[in-house]
Amino acid sequence: MGFFMDTNSSAPNRKPDWLRAKLPSSPAYKEVRDIVDTHQLHTVCQSAQCPNMGECWSRGTATVMILGNVCTRSCTFCAVQTGQPTEFDIGEPARVADAVHTMGLKHCVVTSVARDDLKDGGASVWAATIRAIRHRNPGCGIEVLTADFRGVAEHLDIVLDAEPDIFNHNLETVERLQRPIRRTA
């Protein structure tokens, strides 16, 4: 049995329901957008052009991306802008903590761009952000999704010493595909 398409039909091919995304219109979506804008934050949702942004923001959640929105690497699988980032913003950890408080989150997720231009790869900013969230939002679970810090264990220890509740790092692919897929990741 084959699949045949009626090329004479004027009816458009419709996507299946599970593939269609609704335009974001909920009050929660607007509220998250306003909080992100007011606190001058970046989200991986926006920077990586995530197709699920409308769904997540409509549920009142977003993944904050610290250390700016320009990555020092240019991974083939990622839509985040690459280049030479500007200086990191020392007020960012406090603004992230305030946004978590404003959103009333019981669990927050924070990620970042890779910052190979910084001596510690941004580990000290990670630690400051975790501590600021914890101080402003006691009881809020903190999940982090970090860059690899170029494999420098001391930089990783800086983040771990701040005691995030959940520590993540994406591998993206199997070992034999690391070089072709993740040349700089």
Task: Name each model feature, range by range.
Residues G54-M65, F77-R95:
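Iron-sulfur (Fe-S) cluster-binding segments and ferredoxin-like electron-carrier domains
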Residues P12-K15, C78-Q81, V113, P138:
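Acidic/polar active-site rim loop that often engages polyanionic ligands
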Residues R20, P24, F88, G121:
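Catalytic cores of large soluble enzymes that bind and process phosphate-bearing ligands
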Residues P93-T102, K106-C108, S112-A185:
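Conserved AdoMet/S-adenosylmethionine-binding subsite of the radical SAM
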Residues D37, L41, E55, V80, ...:
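Generic secondary-structure signature for well-ordered alpha-helical cores
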Residues M53, S74, C78, L177-P180:
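Residues that scaffold the ATP/ADP-binding catalytic core of kinase and kinase-like folds
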Residues M1-R73:
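Flexible, acidic/Gly-rich N-terminal and inter-domain linker regions that tether
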Residues M53, L67-N69, Q81, V113, ...:
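Fold-independent oxyanion-binding glycine-rich loops
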